[in-house]
């Protein structure tokens, strides 16, 4: 094959790849101090302790709409994707609901949210988790989204979070809607508790040094149980996390060398699955019951 033909093939491949590029998650780059819910005002009304119901996620698009970066079609398509992702989590996770009254001062001071719907005060009475999708104009071209939890309950369960979207995203490239849906599943999973902050505070991190490098693992009970089945290995002590240097920086993603294809690695991948190992983590937190 001539060099000229090979160059043409390479150019075609590169153009195709750029239209289906798998974007990275920027969550591990966000450095914000988590706030526990003593800054919220819990209501006295509670359900029975063992009454689990499918999780209900409330999205407040007020600030996203006010920012006015997205065209009508892009905005509607993005809202529809968020709704689809919410329904996906309703089919996967159940939770014991607790009524919480939202304090708008907390939203402003800890979540950087100053535009919200008129019914925001009761959002965590009607729902279990409150999420604000917003535009972030400072992301690089390969980071299409990132997320963070701004308010936690006293047991470290997330209650309010923010999903930041790159305004340059497009749902009209090849497979873009599919990729964005899985990226939103990924980002909202961080808000549900797949974060280094929760890992550490629930004592789920185990480390060992291999060839001079400190490796961090999630070693919670059901994660190990599912990992033994998945990898067909009875000696597994945990599932490795991305190593960002030091226990305080243990990443909020699985190590791709071992979990390539799982939706909670830090970069998107062409064939994504929600693995039983990741679902087992959510069950191990004690926040949720899981429908595997």
Write out the residue ranges for each language-model feature:
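Cleavable N-terminal signal peptides of Sec/SRP-targeted secreted and luminal proteins
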Residues: 3-22
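Extracellular zinc-dependent metalloprotease catalytic-domain scaffold
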Residues: 18-185, 191-292
């Amino acid at each position: 094959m001539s060099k000229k033909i090979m160059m043409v093939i390479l150019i075609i491949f590169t153009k195709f790849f750029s239209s289906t590029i798998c974007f990275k998650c920027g969550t591990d780059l966000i450095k914000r101090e988590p706030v526990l819910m003593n800054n919220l005002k819990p209501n006295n009304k509670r359900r029975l302790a063992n009454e689990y119901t499918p999780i209900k996620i409330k999205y407040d698009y007020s600030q996203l709409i006010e920012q006015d970066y997205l065209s009508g079609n892009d905005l509607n398509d993005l809202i529809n994707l968020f709704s689809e992702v919410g329904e996906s989590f309703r089919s996967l996770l159940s939770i014991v609901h607790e009524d919480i009254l939202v304090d708008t001062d907390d939203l402003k001071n800890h979540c950087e949210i100053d535009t919200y719907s008129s019914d925001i005060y009761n959002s965590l009475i009607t729902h279990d988790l409150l999420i604000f999708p917003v535009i972030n104009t400072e992301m690089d071209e390969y980071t299409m989204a990132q997320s963070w939890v701004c308010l936690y309950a006293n047991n470290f369960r997330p209650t309010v979070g923010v999903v930041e979207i790159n305004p340059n995203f497009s749902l009209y490239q090849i497979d873009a809607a599919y990729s964005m849906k899985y990226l939103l599943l990924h980002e909202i999973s961080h808000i549900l508790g797949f974060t280094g902050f929760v890992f550490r505070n629930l004592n789920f991190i185990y480390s060992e040094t291999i060839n001079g490098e400190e490796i961090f693992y999630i070693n919670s009970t059901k994660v190990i149980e599912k990992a033994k089945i998945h990898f067909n290995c009875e000696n597994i002590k945990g599932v490795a996390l991305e190593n960002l240097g030091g226990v305080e920086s243990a990443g909020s993603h699985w190590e791709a060398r071992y979990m390539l294809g799982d939706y909670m690695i830090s970069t998107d991948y062409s064939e994504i699955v929600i693995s039983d190992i990741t679902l087992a983590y959510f069950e191990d937190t004690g926040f949720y019951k899981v429908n595997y």
